[in-house]
Amino acid sequence: MLPEQWDTFKRAARLEKLERIPMALIVDSPWIPGYLGIKHMDYYLDPEVWFEANLKIMREFPDIIFVPSWWMEYGMAAEPSVLGAKIKFWQDNTPSEYHTLYRLEDIDNFPEYEVEADAFAAMTLHRYGMHRQRILDHGYILPLVTSRGPLCTAGFVRSTTNLMIELVENPEGCHKLIDLCTRVIIDWLKAQHKVIGDTVEGIFILDDIVGFINEEHYQEFAHPYLKRICDAFPKDWVKIYHNDAEVDACLDYLPDAGFHVLNWGKQKDIREVKQRVGDRMCLMGNVNPLEIGVRGTPEEVREATLDVLEGSGGEGVILSVGGGTSPGMPRENIVAMQDALQEFNASRRVRVGARHG
């Protein structure tokens, strides 16, 4: 991400009126290796391949704000690996996570964690430290530190199925696990900030498992922990939340948790989301990422993009797909989104000019 792109993103996050709606995409290892024709293992384990891949993407699409920017990740492995989850790697896919907390009460026997030294968190920090100055020398910045959320992490450590059952059958044990995951996440974000330095001005939290629970369980098992994470960082930092599962139960509470930007899934029309939280959050979405973004024609992408933009009312929005960029999304469909946005921004300027003419 370029400094001027981050400035635009911050202004959008604060619901400032912008002359043009910006476009941002969440890109990481589910999409980048396949798009560039490289092996996932090379992307993860060869520092030069990782650096050149990210540089190529940013140069190929200079007008798109890539979030979180130079994201060093091993799929979803870093956070659960700190707490002992088993990680399997594949040549042509992201890693798989397997739970190792077979009984919830065994959490009392967990060894103390240390994010700077533990598993894939330590490897991630090393890569950031290795390439930080090189990234800056190319004119880019690293404005965001990133983590999976507390329920997502807990689900990998205990298994999502077991966690869902135990929210009902053993709420006390679940609170203990989610509290531990929250502490890991806060320390993990702070460790990234320490390595990356003073270009960091925001956090990016991804937690789809929040979308698996009802409103009552959200209030008890998710909201207090998400708020703790947001409260652990400066008030003027931008806080982004991603959940491309169902957001109905949590949507109205996310601004109170401390989030400024919401990236949500294809399930809920932007008009409803705008009506419910559009005066309190910037909406980053929500072109259907799979059926349209990957499988659609450029014309279908154009139509879907214009529908999202019209539904947004042209304010308080950052154009994106509904979630992360899906594996297999082709260049022509990304360009179709850009072209539709340019078309919308041009017509918007004409309409605004006519009102003031």
Question: Where is each model-derived feature located?
Answer:
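A contiguous, low-structure linker/loop signature
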Residues: 71-113
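Membrane helical hairpin/interfacial module
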Residues: 55-79
